[in-house]
Curated annotation (Swiss-Prot):
The glycine cleavage system catalyzes the degradation of glycine. It comes from Oceanobacillus iheyensis (strain DSM 14371 / CIP 107618 / JCM 11309 / KCTC 3954 / HTE831). Pfam families: GCV_T, GCV_T_C. Keywords: Aminotransferase, Transferase. This is Aminomethyltransferase. The lineage of its organism: Bacteria, Bacillati, Bacillota, Bacilli, Bacillales. One of its GO terms (cellular component) is cytosol.
């Protein structure tokens, strides 16, 4: 069995009481205090996440834009340096390779941030699809060069501002600043107004050698604002409430972005052809047989990943993610089900272990900031 991978921040976990687990081959903190507490801290104050396990793939060269237009579903011709974009890679049959964020660093320089468990698969897939020469495009997995930390929550702006003379408030949503100087830290950082919690906040990319120093700086400057380190457990409940897809659950090689409600990131009418376009265009124009919906339990029980959803004793789909929502204090889930049963208010059943429990279709997201 291969040894578990660890991020450069691993050495800091124990002093904060972290309980670690194996997450896709990585030794990562599932929680520091409790999932519910960490969830609440992020929603009301601010949370600090070590997300250095995420993958980074560099795509550079004069043909990088035209190549990325071919492998990504969104339209990156809309990007200018300093802008980021949520996008997806699909197979020819419309299934999902991965969802990711692309950063345009310069006209011929892009950084793709992909899901940790998919990094090697994604890098190989991208290289396999490339038909350009090395003079035209260079693709490199640069994951080991970066530490990625996320600071999320209503106090995130105030805390990060204490760490730099750069005005972070003026970084708009899905925009970023590169080469930002941080107080007392050697390496410069890329600071992006993005996140995976449904809260305001930033994702910060810095050279791996300065990662621990950045972690300590943020916790020190954020102490007065109630900043705490947050584990994977709360990261999952936060993203779930905000209806942010998780690869392997809401998206997979068998689930298209259109089925998952991510059509906003699939530009079927952009000029260049892209992988999966034909199938995805058909799904956009003619609809899909399945759709991702919200489910709220009527009977007592928690809907978990892969539990069956039934109507009149017939299977109509399955739960992709589910939990007791810390914000709503309700048992809710996301489910991919037959399009005929997706109207809000429709009653369905969920098979929780051997019990058949009542539930109903409800709107998503379960949580929206400021609402």
């Amino acid at each position: 069995m291969s040894e578990q991978k660890r991020t450069p921040i691993f050495t800091e976990y124990a002093s904060h009481g972290a309980k670690t687990i194996d997450f896709g081959g990585w030794d990562l903190p599932v929680q520091f205090s409790s999932i519910k507490h960490e969830h609440e801290v992020t929603r009301t104050k601010a949370g600090l996440f070590d997300v250095s396990h995420m993958g980074e793939i560099s795509v550079k060269g004069p043909k990088s834009e035209s190549f990325l237009q071919y492998v990504l579903t969104n339209d990156i011709s809309k990007l200018e340096p300093g802008k980021a974009q949520y996008t997806i890679m699909c197979y020819e049959d419309g299934g999902t390779v991965d969802d990711l964020i692309v950063y345009k660093l310069d006209d011929e320089d892009y950084l793709l941030v992909v899901n940790a468990a998919n990094t090697e698969k994604d890098a190989n897939w991208i290289k396999q699809k490339n038909t350009y020469s090395n003079d035209e495009i260079v693709i490199e997995d640069v994951s080991n060069q970066y530490v990625q930390l996320a600071i999320q929550g209503p106090k995130a702006v105030e805390i990060l501002q204490k760490c730099t003379d750069e005005n972070v408030q003026e970084i708009k949503f899905f925009r970023f600043k590169n080469n930002v100087a941080l107080k007392g830290i050697e390496a410069k950082a890329l600071i992006s107004r993005t996140g995976y919690t449904g809260e305001d906040g930033f994702e910060i990319y810095i050279d791996a050698s300065s990662g621990v120093a950045l972690w300590k700086l943020l916790l020190e400057k954020g102490e007065a604002n109630g900043l705490e380190p947050i584990g994977l457990g709360a990261r999952d409940t936060l993203r779930f409430e905000a209806n942010l897809a998780l690869y392997g659950q809401e998206l997979s090689k068998d689930i298209s972005p259109i089925e998952a409600g991510l059509g906003f990131a699939v530009k079927v009418n952009k000029g260049p052809d892209f992988i999966g376009k034909e199938v995805l265009k058909n799904q956009v124009e003619n609809g899909t047989d399945r759709k991702l919906v919200g489910i709220e339990m009527i009977d007592k029980g928690i809907p978990r990943h892969e539990y069956e959803v039934l109507k009149d004793n017939k299977e109509i789909g399955f739960i992709t993610s589910g939990t007791q929502s810390p914000t709503l204090n309700k048992n809710v889930g996301l489910a991919l089900i037959n399009i005929s049963y997706t109207e809000i208010g429709t009653e369905v059943d969920v098979k929780v272990r051997k019990r058949i429990l009542k539930a109903k279709i409800v709107p998503t997201p379960f949580y929206k900031r400021g609402r």
